[in-house]
Curated annotation (Swiss-Prot):
Enzyme class per UniProt: hydrolase
Localization per record: Cytoplasm
Organism of origin: Pectobacterium carotovorum subsp. carotovorum (strain PC1)
Protein name (database record): Putative pre-16S rRNA nuclease
Keyword Nuclease: yes
GO annotation (BP), single: rRNA 5'-end processing
Length: 139
């Protein structure tokens, strides 16, 4: 089995979290987060991440309502994924991200209390949860 390097994005209109993982181990770790202006990232930062890590696949979290229906942010996350593919030619997978932020907050709080709950840490941790959930769904 070939080990693929996979980047995951937790898309948001104000901030985007990023994680990196290896498919063969099914593990991920937080990389970074960066600000977005109304959902538009600094594309130079995105390009730098993609060229540095050279992922075989990019997973973008898809924000859905608890009943699985789409919300306004869902279309924006899809648009972000389409732009990633269009600009950089990377393979894209969309993955349900319901409750990833809640889980990330709980994990971070457990490890470091309120001090660990800064926005960037939460977004990057959410990207880890999205990617690990995607790994689990593949098996």
């Amino acid at each position: 089995m070939k080990s693929r390097t996979i980047l995951a994005f937790d898309f948001g209109t104000k901030s985007i979290g990023v994680a990196i993982g290896q498919e063969i181990t099914g593990t991920a770790r937080p990389l970074t987060s960066f600000k977005a202006q109304e959902g538009i990232p600094d594309w130079q930062k995105v390009e730098k991440l993609l060229s540095e890590w050279q992922p075989d696949l990019v997973v973008v979290g898809l924000p859905l309502n608890m009943d699985g229906t789409e919300q306004p942010l869902t279309a924006r996350a899809r648009k972000f994924a389409n732009r990633l593919h269009g600009r950089f030619g990377v393979a894209i997978a969309l993955h349900d991200e319901r409750l990833s932020t809640v889980e990330a907050r709980a994990d971070l709080f457990e490890r470091g209390g309120f001090k660990a709950l800064d926005k960037g840490s939460v977004d990057a941790a959410s990207a880890v949860i999205i990617l690990e959930s995607w790994f689990e769904a593949q098996h």
